[in-house]
């Protein structure tokens, strides 16, 4: 069996590809919605966040031969847990990650953390749109909501827990954009104009995450961009295509 951390839409497509290559695959996802397309493709699914101990137990109980970590580029804890579990059980760890993109824009500020992004946003002021999801929303609400010269607008997935979190953090309903992509450049541009955005905050999650569309639209309107770089994790070899992952599995799981 292969344990595959499927934290993104392309990761779930990878799980299907690995199954088609003849492997018994169990994919891990965090939400019920993420499990649906995998279940339709008859891929076994385990729902919920796994600790290192959870992964280690699963590996031992099910005779897992390798971990394929296709979690989101910013799912730092999940990757560290997978690396630790693979090391503890002496099985191969294979990392799949969306290819990075290089952007050139005078009004783009690169930062390393969400906290740093919030600091820069506070300095820039104006109408700030977050496209970084709900997980780290509190970092921005604590820093930006008290400022009278800042309007904080947050775009996130239309999930009940996200709306509840916005309410708990005091983000006004009129400043919540609950919607699911992917989005075109034209859509992003219209959204920026509708809200009068002056600063867009995003993270370098790759082309599949439509970061390029967000950036292109922002550049056309002359907006300031704050880009959060990917976490620095020692993955070892990183593969960016499905074919490379399957080839690595073939080479590393031979008896």
UniProtKB/Swiss-Prot annotation:
Keyword NAD recorded: yes
Catalytic activity: Co-precorrin-6B + NAD(+) = Co-precorrin-6A + NADH + H(+)
A GO biological-process term: cobalamin biosynthetic process
Pathway(s) where this gene product acts: Cofactor biosynthesis; adenosylcobalamin biosynthesis; cob(II)yrinate a,c-diamide from sirohydrochlorin (anaerobic route): step 7/10
Keywords of the record: Cobalamin biosynthesis, NAD, Oxidoreductase
EC nos: 1.3.1.106
Function field: Catalyzes the reduction of the macrocycle of cobalt-precorrin-6A to cobalt-precorrin-6B.
Family assignment from sequence similarity: Belongs to the precorrin-6x reductase family.
Name of this protein: Cobalt-precorrin-6A reductase
The species this protein was found in: Priestia megaterium (Bacillus megaterium)
């Amino acid at each position: 069996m292969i344990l595959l951390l499927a934290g993104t839409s392309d990761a779930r497509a990878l799980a299907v590809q690995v199954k088609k290559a003849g492997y018994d695959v169990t994919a891990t996802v965090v939400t019920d919605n993420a499990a649906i397309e995998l279940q339709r493709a008859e891929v076994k699914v385990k729902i919920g966040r796994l600790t290192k101990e959870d992964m280690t137990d699963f590996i031992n109980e099910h005779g897992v031969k390798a971990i394929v970590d296709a979690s989101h580029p910013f799912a730092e804890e999940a990757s560290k847990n997978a690396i630790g579990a693979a090391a503890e059980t002496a099985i191969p760890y294979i990392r799949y990650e969306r290819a990075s993109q290089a952007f050139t824009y005078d009004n783009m500020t690169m930062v390393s953390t969400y906290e740093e992004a919030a600091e820069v946003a506070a300095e820039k002021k104006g109408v700030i749109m977050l496209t970084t999801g709900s997980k780290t929303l509190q970092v921005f609400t604590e820093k930006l909501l008290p400022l009278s010269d800042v309007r904080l607008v947050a775009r996130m997935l239309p999930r009940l827990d996200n709306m509840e979190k916005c309410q708990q953090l005091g983000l006004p309903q009129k400043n919540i954009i609950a919607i699911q992509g992917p989005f075109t450049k034209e859509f992003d541009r219209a959204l920026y104009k509708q809200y009068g955005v002056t600063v867009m905050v995003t993270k370098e999650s790759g082309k599949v995450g439509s970061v390029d569309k967000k950036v292109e639209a922002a550049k056309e309107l002359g907006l300031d961009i704050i880009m959060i770089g990917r976490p620095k994790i020692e993955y070892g070899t990183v593969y960016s295509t499905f074919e490379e992952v399957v080839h690595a599995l073939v080479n590393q799981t031979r008896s």
